[in-house]
């Protein structure tokens, strides 16, 4: 594989000047020999008209941003280079400086005393011009190219075959032979060390712009640090336009060609503007948006009915310059016309398949992952809607009736718990779930004095109440009656607590207080609510617990005999006493014999409670 090099492109003044500067800095780097009386400068540089021949022998690595290969170069052209310098012609001076370097260390050279010979210290410089021409190169080299690191060139062999050296001392044969040998050795060192460095810097100049930009920024920052006048500031801004600047800003030729091609293509009066690859033009943006595949277009393509149904809607959105790529909400809603709209499941499947195809198209095929999507449950019933209707708070009139009435007496089955009987003055929504088979007790109104018509009470969370707060809308008579009933209940409750504490089973009292607190705040504080609650038993034999006898068992028969002595009806309800004593559940009823309100415990069928009455025993231990 071989290719030709456009050698004429190198004949440019900027490249020639830049090459001269690089060669000058390279030749004068390091310590100059004592035979030279001045620095080396490049007087003439010409690349010639004949290009070298390159032949690629092997390609080890080839990619967009890197390349590594072995090539062969053969050059027999008309390249010539002229160097100018001054040579020391006084041999005593040369010998004097050479002896100082060998005998005396450079660090102590100023302190060492030497004889001051006038003849040896005098310099006698002669100008010298060296011309290098007729260069013949034949060698094998290795090229390593990287877009970020530039180009590196290394030769395997000595590529220099011959070179012609001509100077101002050609008339002296001894000096001509000496210069020929010395320059050949220096050129071999040039191909071995200097030329790879020059090529590397040249490649960085045209491939990487970061270094030039960083150098310009550093130079600008140095100039800004020094106080400058307006004229100096204006001159510093011309740094980018100055052709003689040390660090000119150079753009990539490839990018410049693309920009020029785009610019020239618009300098036309043609109606059809030429297209460019991977470029979206503003004049064609509308067509590009319509033809671009999206979710809505895919749905219309898969469903013929949707095309006829929403074609007017799409035209309306396009006329209003609105985005029609969104999915209308009507597609997912069900209407009366099931033939066209009752396709929610199929639409969701189409949307899922389209999104999955797009996801797997751009994802990694080696390690595919499932897309994360949200699950939509269509036609799901709202279960909390029924709970909200049952847990709504009562009206103010109903709250007033709750405050002014008491519970109607009724028998409680073993399956029901004490929580079914509300003991609240003011109803509050209850957070826990209650079984639907538990019915709320009825309420009695004070105006009628009967328990026939009553509304169901809402099961609510107990709220502590320490002081009686009547409603402003109630009448004075109702308020007075409520206070009297409340005082009677407080007396009965206190009497019940005193009786329990004076009984022979204090352990049972402590157990009820500690375990039967129920729900709510202030369970153990006096006057918080109407009665003590029991903990709900989850044992499968909870209905048989009343037959068990524990250490804290209380003989209710003896207590009944004591309580019958304080009855006011003279044993009127003795027949029902035994039957009702089986259900040891506290309840409330109205005493209709004397027309006054009172609190009775259903287990003993006790009528109205007075100051001399004794409360019934507590519920059985379980």
Curated annotation (Swiss-Prot):
Q: What is its subcellular localisation?
A: Mitochondrion outer membrane
Specify the protein's topology with respect to the membrane. Multi-pass membrane protein
Q: Which cysteines are joined by disulfide bonds?
A: none
Basic residues composition-biased segments: 370-384
Coarse class of the protein's main subcellular location: mitochondrion
Query: InterPro entries under this entry?
Result: Mdm34 (IPR027536), SMP_LBD (IPR031468)
Comp. bias regions, Low complexity: 571-583
GO molecular function, a single term:
lipid binding
Q: Where is this region: Disordered?
A: 362-399, 568-592
Domain SMP-LTD: from-to ranges: 1-204
The alphabetical list of record keywords is:
Lipid transport, Lipid-binding, Membrane, Mitochondrion, Mitochondrion outer membrane, Transmembrane, Transmembrane beta strand, Transport
GO CC, sorted alphabetically, is:
ERMES complex
Polar residues bias: start-end ranges: 390-399
Record's keyword annotation contains Lipid biosynthesis: no
An example Gene Ontology biological process? phospholipid transport
* Similarity comment: Belongs to the MDM34 family.
Q: In UniProt terms, what function does this protein have?
A: Component of the ERMES/MDM complex, which serves as a molecular tether to connect the endoplasmic reticulum (ER) and mitochondria. Components of this complex are involved in the control of mitochondrial shape and protein biogenesis, and function in nonvesicular lipid trafficking between the ER and mitochondria. MDM34 is required for the interaction of the ER-resident membrane protein MMM1 and the outer mitochondrial membrane-resident beta-barrel protein MDM10.
Assembly and partners are described as: Component of the ER-mitochondria encounter structure (ERMES) or MDM complex, composed of MMM1, MDM10, MDM12 and MDM34.
HAMAP family (UniProt xref): Mdm34 (MF_03105)
Entry note about domains: Lacks alpha-helical transmembrane segments, suggesting that it resides in the membrane via beta-sheet conformations similar to those predicted for other outer membrane proteins and porin. The SMP-LTD domain is a barrel-like domain that can bind various types of glycerophospholipids in its interior and mediate their transfer between two adjacent bilayers.
Name of the protein = Mitochondrial distribution and morphology protein 34
The source organism is Candida dubliniensis (strain CD36 / ATCC MYA-646 / CBS 7987 / NCPF 3949 / NRRL Y-17841) (Yeast)
